[in-house]
């Protein structure tokens, strides 16, 4: 991505080097795979957690005992600082794009805050942990990211490249857009009343909508700033491919269980991201209007 000269967002809390409490153990083998699955689960990173956080948005949320936050002084490497700057530039890009889109549709975009943290963090949705991957909490309208997640994406799934990382952030912001439009709250209220299998189906549609919104952002960001370079789109498509339910489940346990899918197959994730990228039209994000076969 071409980001030279692009502004950084001021809506960032850098809590790296601060202790946010004990990390939560997810207890399902292959911690990185579980983290990636949690990242994609749209408010229900694991079945056991979903019922506790149905009213909250996010790509993972845990409840836990609040503990004192302490500061640990350390210097960050140049790579860590560059990744932090990159993340704030991407957030700034989402602010510019969604402010424009909301204004064109007669509304006002309320920007979210990005929280950078290490290991564990306190949120309005409960205790967060790096094992969960990036997540959005509707309780405080903040997205939380432990930047080490991007290294895990690269080493465990081969999802690498700056645009793949940007896709992750844009997906999180996509859940914030769902919150602002009321979609997130409505769907989670419905999910709380349904069986696990039926709730999973709604979760898939919520996740695919966030993928679509990530594509919409990329379309307009490139139109406004000429940010995309050769290979960028392929990076994001590859990322979407390796974080589908079917791919992750097969990698984690050798087989997939379609009934348990709650964030979409690789094919579905690629389809909706590409649709947003190609059209840039939020009216095309009809993940809740099409049939299961059309997803």
Spans of features found by a protein language model:
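Active-site recognition of the HExxH zinc-binding catalytic motif
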Residues: 36, 98, 145, 163-180, ...
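Structural recognition of the beta-strand scaffold that forms the well-ordered cores
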Residues: 20, 24-26, 115, 143-146, ...
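Long amphipathic alpha-helical segments used for membrane anchoring, targeting, substrate engagement
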Residues: 1-75
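Short pre-active-site segment immediately N-terminal to the catalytic Zn-binding motif
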Residues: 149-168, 198-204
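Pan-zinc metallopeptidase signature
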Residues: 241-295
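Short helix/loop segments within enzyme catalytic domains
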Residues: 81, 85-109, 198-201, 205-248
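Catalytic zinc-binding patch centered on the HExxH motif and its immediate surroundings
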Residues: 120-146
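Catalytic Zn2+-binding segment of zinc metalloproteases
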Residues: 173-188, 221-222
């Amino acid at each position: 991505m071409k980001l030279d000269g692009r502004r950084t967002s001021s809506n960032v809390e850098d809590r790296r080097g601060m202790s946010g409490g004990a990390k939560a153990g997810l207890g399902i083998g292959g911690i990185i795979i579980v983290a990636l699955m949690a990242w994609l689960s749209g408010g229900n990173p694991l079945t056991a957690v979903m019922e506790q956080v149905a009213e909250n948005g996010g790509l993972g949320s845990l409840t836990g005992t609040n503990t004192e936050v302490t500061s640990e002084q350390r210097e960050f490497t140049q790579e860590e600082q560059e990744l932090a700057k990159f993340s704030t530039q991407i957030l700034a890009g989402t602010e510019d794009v969604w402010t424009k889109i909301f204004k064109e549709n007669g509304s006002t975009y309320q920007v979210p805050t990005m929280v950078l943290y290490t290991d564990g963090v306190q949120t309005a949705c409960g205790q967060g942990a790096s094992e969960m991957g990036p997540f959005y909490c509707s309780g405080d309208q903040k997205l939380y990211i432990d930047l080490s997640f991007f290294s895990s994406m690269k080493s465990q799934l081969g999802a690498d490249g700056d645009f793949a990382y940007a896709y992750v952030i844009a997906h999180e912001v996509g859940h914030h857009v769902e919150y602002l439009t009321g979609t997130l709250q409505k769907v989670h209220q419905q999910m709380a009343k349904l069986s696990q299998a039926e709730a999973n189906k709604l979760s898939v549609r919520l996740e695919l909508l966030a993928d679509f919104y990530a594509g919409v952002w990329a379309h307009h960001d490139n139109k406004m700033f000429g940010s995309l370079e050769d290979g960028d789109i392929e990076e994001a498509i590859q990322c979407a491919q390796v974080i589908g339910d079917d791919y992750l489940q097969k990698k984690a346990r050798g087989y997939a269980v379609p009934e348990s899918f709650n964030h979409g197959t690789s094919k579905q994730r690629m389809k909706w991201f590409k649709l947003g990228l190609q059209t840039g039209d939020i009216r095309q994000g009809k993940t809740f209007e099409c049939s299961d076969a059309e997803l």
